[in-house]
């Protein structure tokens, strides 16, 4: 039944992201609670606070107390799109990964992040914006992963078109 596949209603909650630096990091615009939840495999309610410092992000959550690089966060829509400098920062960060096979690619959870954002997109135009964003950073994914992401994008787009 198609109606049972509707994404949940938008939930408005107070942000737990606090900017502690007077000089924001260029990648600070991509820090989101959704990304933190996927990064650490926790729920929104488990996050106590996220502090954005000059060079790192401090995440304090239930069972988590960790410093995270800004380059670990995927881009998002609704803010300035990623620039060439952002691409360089991401690639430099990925080269530091211990897994040889993934040194040229984004972390695996980025795929989950984009699929989740496709699913939560309230309108076709927002979904299209997410699709364009993934298209600009397709270098970050293997061919198989990119095919999976765009396959899900196509299914989600079709569902939203049928609903709208």
Tell me the role of every PLM-derived stretch.
Residues 8-10, 16, 132, 147, ...:
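Residue-level marker of intrinsically disordered, low-complexity segments enriched
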Residues 103-121:
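N-terminal acidic leader/helix
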């Amino acid at each position: 039944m198609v109606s049972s596949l509707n994404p949940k209603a938008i939930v408005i909650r107070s942000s737990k992201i606090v900017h502690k630096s007077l000089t924001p990091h260029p990648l600070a615009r991509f820090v989101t609670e959704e990304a933190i939840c996927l990064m650490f495999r926790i729920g929104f309610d488990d996050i106590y606070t996220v502090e954005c410092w000059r060079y790192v992000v401090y995440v304090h959550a239930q069972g988590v107390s960790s410093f995270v690089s800004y380059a670990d966060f995927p881009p998002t829509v609704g803010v300035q799109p990623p620039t060439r400098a952002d691409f360089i920062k991401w690639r430099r960060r990925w080269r530091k990964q211990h897994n040889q096979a993934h040194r040229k690619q984004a972390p695996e959870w980025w795929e989950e992040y984009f699929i989740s954002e496709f699913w939560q997109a309230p309108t076709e135009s927002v979904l299209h914006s997410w699709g364009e964003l993934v298209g600009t950073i397709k270098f970050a994914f293997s061919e198989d992963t990119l095919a999976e992401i765009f396959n899900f994008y196509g299914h989600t787009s079709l569902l939203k078109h049928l609903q709208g």
